């Protein structure tokens, strides 16, 4: 098993960040459209906070894309990461989750997010073209 793990939430954040940048939208503008502070939005995009289903729909609306298009991009990215075998993709354990408490973090690998995850995804996208 790989040492490095990524969460579904951090993948969603990177997918959203890439789409936002592609459209030339600043974080603060998208945050405002979603009814969030720029700091709260930044935590979502970096994977430090998790998107709620409501926020995912609001984000898609603010980006001017269908929610299923956003979800499809996340699923494709997850599949590409799994195929690369460079990282393991899984739900990030929650502090109050029974599994997280029982494992005590001993066998939980390093979650990567933010710029490192973005670079990995961009690298994989370049290989698939």
Set out the residue ranges of the language-model regions.
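A short, Lys/Arg-rich alpha-helix, primarily the initiator
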Residues: 1-22
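Residues that mark the N-terminal boundary/hinge immediately upstream of a DNA-recognition element
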Residues: 15, 26, 52-55, 66
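The alpha-helix within a helix-turn-helix
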Residues: 20, 31, 60
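Short alpha-helical DNA-recognition segment
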Residues: 24-43
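DNA major-groove recognition helix of helix-turn-helix/homeodomain DNA-binding modules
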Residues: 35, 54-69
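Short, charged recognition helix plus adjacent turn
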Residues: 72-108
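Hydrophobic alpha-helical topogenic segments used for membrane insertion/localization
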Residues: 103-127
């Amino acid at each position: 098993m790989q040492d490095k793990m990524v969460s579904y939430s951090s993948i969603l954040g990177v997918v959203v960040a890439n789409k936002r940048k592609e459209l030339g939208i600043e974080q603060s503008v998208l945050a405002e459209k979603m009814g969030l502070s720029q700091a709260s939005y930044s935590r979502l995009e970096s994977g430090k906070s998790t998107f709620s289903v409501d926020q995912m729909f609001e984000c898609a609306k603010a980006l001017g894309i269908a929610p299923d298009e956003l979800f499809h991009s996340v699923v494709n990215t997850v599949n590409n990461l799994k195929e690369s075998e460079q990282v393991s993709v899984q739900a990030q354990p929650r502090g109050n989750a029974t599994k997280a408490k029982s494992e005590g973090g001993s066998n939980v690998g390093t979650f990567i997010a933010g710029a490192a995850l973005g670079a990995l995804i961009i690298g994989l996208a370049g290989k698939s073209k």
